[in-house]
UniProtKB/Swiss-Prot annotation:
It catalyses: [protein]-peptidylproline (omega=180) = [protein]-peptidylproline (omega=0). Keywords: Cell cycle, Cell division, Chaperone, Cytoplasm, Isomerase, Rotamase. The lineage of its organism: Bacteria, Pseudomonadati, Campylobacterota, Epsilonproteobacteria, Campylobacterales. GO terms for molecular function: peptidyl-prolyl cis-trans isomerase activity; protein folding chaperone; ribosome binding. InterPro entries: PPIase_dom_sf, PPIase_FKBP_dom, Trig_fac, Trigger_fac_C, Trigger_fac_C_sf, Trigger_fac_ribosome-bd_bac, Trigger_fac_ribosome-bd_sf, Trigger_fact/SurA_dom_sf. It comes from Campylobacter concisus (strain 13826). This is Trigger factor. The gene is tig.
Amino acid sequence: MEIKIKALNSVNTLASTTISADAIKSSVEKLAKKAAKTMKVDGFRQGHVPVAVVLKRYEKELTNDAEQDVLRDVVEEAIKKAGKKNDDLIGEPIVSKFDRKDDKIDVELTVSFKPSVDVSGYESLIPEFSNPRVLKKDIDEKKAELLKMIAPLEKIDGKRGLKVGDFAKFDFEGFVDGVAFDGGKAENYVLEIGSNQFIPGFEDGMVGMKVGSEKDIEVKFPENYGAANLAGKDAVFKIKLHEIQERKIPEKLDEEMLKMVLPNEENPTEELLEERIKEQIRQEKIYKLINEELKPKFAEAAVEKFKFDVPKNIVEQEIDMQFRNAWSSFTPDDMKKFREDKDALAKKRDEYRKDAENSVRLTFIIDELARVRGVKVSDQEVVQAIYFEAYRSGQDPKAHLEMYRNQGMLPAIKMSMIEEKLFSELFNKEKDEKKASKKEKAE
């Protein structure tokens, strides 16, 4: 089998060849002989199934396997002829032609390799910025929010009606078309009015109710409601209000509250709490600054400065993803056109190509920067992050991890964590200032 190769650029190579029907037939026979040694077929002892029987029963599957084997041979030869190694290969080859004819198969495919990336001089691309300031009013507002969260609930004595901000203890049962539905009933449920935890109209309908009163509230489930059997349906909830509670927010934190918000401190004080709040706000502001301003500026400058060829197959995957994300925004006519007209589809995909190439290029730049700066994320850190996400959303952590593993998402999550860690380090002005100070003292 003679294979011709053509270098499209430094990382993409086009390979073409013609596979004879005899080569496929020979490969099919080899696979059939191998399968006959282990296959179980009724009427024959295991390991004694005639090859002719295997061929007759599984010819289609064996032919597919043989063609895949031959394609792998083409890829192996293309790698050698391109002067590369197997480790240089990235992703799956793009098979652009596989034309079956009577006595041959014409094959054309593109293999892609990892690019060589040089990020020398990246330091000059880091945008100038000042560490965000934390004002006293920011700390006071955060502390007030904290006080509100931990303040105890107290039962309201009197006959006033329920208002926004109150906590209602009540029974409810929901009905659609006069029939109670699963999950629509609870007793002594506590709900903050105005928190929007329930569907639109529910909490508003309770405002003004008094303790001991009953009311029917008419609502409509949102069209995108999670339970398909309720989405878009009109419903009636029968309500009975038992208690009205409100938070009694203290003017100042007492010792018990300080221990609650600073559980690991031997001597929790309000001053220490304010320091922690200040640091939390500072980190939030830095995170916002990095993600909304610094990172986009750095990424744009890096893609412009570091030019290199990118793997075609990875770019096509990125285009696939961008196209899928945009699909719901297309008109029905456009969707029909893209399904039926290959040229129109190809033209539309090309609109995403430049952004896709830049996105892939940035991924390789980030990967190299992480290597240069020694930024790593262990598999254990990935698992911990997934577990934390599960705990926060009330899900089973092991099942959550398994879901990501089955979806093949773990490498992407790890890359995302490396990226976040890298940019946090790149834009850590305080760390750089400390390094500079140490260097000056040493000199």
